Amino acid sequence: SAEGDELIVINGTEITRKFPPGHINAVFVKDANKLINIDRSRQPEVDEYIEGLPKDLIQEYIDEPWLNDGVLAALWPIEETLMEAKNQEAFVFWNHPAWSSEEESSDKLLHEIHIDLFNQNLIHGIEVVNGIWFSDEAFQIAIDYDLTIIGTSDVHGLIDWDYLQRPNGHRSVTLILSEDKTEKSIKDALFKGRTVVWYKNILIGKNENVQEIIDASLSIKNAYFKGNTNVLLVEIENISDANFQLSVNDGQLIENNPNIFSVAPHGITKIEIGNSKSTKVNLGVDVLNAYIAPNTHPS
């Protein structure tokens, strides 16, 4: 359906297991059917499991064939499933580790099985953002285990219902810093961890990737002295869709703004720097709507 369009459709599938490890996605798969292994001889285990589920949770699904087969499929060891995904050269990431329905069953996100899967290179990324949820703990796990940082909208209905009706709303997305717009380049970038998440106008990622987005978005468009004064008028341009929040961190005096100011999407903000001696601008700022680690802004 995307033929002749700029849209790139990438094959993928979800791999669901009881937490831990939880929900996992595999993209760039070649045959999703090979990631399902149903052994009918284990039906008694399925019956016992379904019998133990809360009735109010499964009542509307109890007669659906997919419920029974889904539980059967989940009995296949996760390591074997992910090894098949690896054989298909798929990119695999851990979904919504901080999702409330899973978190309630455990006092921590990270378990030994997750670490084992990381160490075997069977999981390559982790969602630090899912829909309206952001997890500092998942962000730290990504940094500690060098996982690709992922953010998704997890939209099950219409995007308008969840996002676009809000003022300045946008869906949570993963910005992929690929060499070009091809499936191969996108896949290479994901495996190399070259991503930044854009969530509620916040950029989240590893320092080098976030800095690349900032450098590509913001620039000094013009700088000139105001009349015969030593006040330098500086025009800062933002060519991106994000609204940047900047805080001056080098002690320079901003005369027409507080030391915290914003640069609107596709806009220009003018600031006046006092006691300037040159039109060469070297302004130190923290980017307040970006994080390169939990509670850490890039400078």
Outline where the language-model segments fall.
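A metal-dependent hydrolase metal-coordination microenvironment
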Residues: 1-91, 95, 103, 127-139
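Charged catalytic cores and adjacent phosphate/nucleic-acid-binding surfaces used
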Residues: 19-30, 102-299
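Glycine-rich phosphate-binding "P-loop"
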Residues: 99
